[in-house]
């Protein structure tokens, strides 16, 4: 019996290894939050940067299985990262007047003494409807956190503001139409701005 050529054996091993490697699946990575729950690092809805100084986002409002989408871009180089900037807001109906707000903040938690410690939803008159507390720093990359908030009947336009421990409110806020999910970014500067019906998207 003639021994198989060495080249044929190596080729067979290479094909087998390629097939095995192609079958491997990687589960989404998670990090542990200081409040005990896992935080997906590859969560859908997180803001992704394209590496060229811009952040591309797509906002989605879903109710009753239907969704409306809006896509736009924000020049992140224009943001003052000392402020807790709101760069994206998506809404999901949670039944009745309850709405789940998923808010993406962009703040330099690494380069500041304090970190972005909450975001909140307000009426146009400035009355707080709800707040999402943030218990620890989140580096400098944009990050998204969600909270379910009751929106009063007749309220169709709200303001979402970020807050950080050092500078308070300021930076970019987002005015949101709670029925369509449309958003409008507003540069407030270092102090919180006042809003009215004319600011709604």
Curated annotation (Swiss-Prot):
The modification N-acetylcysteine is found at residue 23. A lipid is attached at residue 23 (S-archaeol cysteine). GO terms for cellular component: plasma membrane. It is found in: Cell membrane. Residues 1-22 form the signal peptide. Residues 25-78, 182-201 are annotated as: Disordered. Residues 69-78 have a biased composition (Basic and acidic residues). It is a lipid-anchor. The keyword Acetylation applies. Its main location: membrane. Keywords: Acetylation, Cell membrane, Lipoprotein, Membrane, Signal. This is Putative lipoprotein Hmuk_2215.
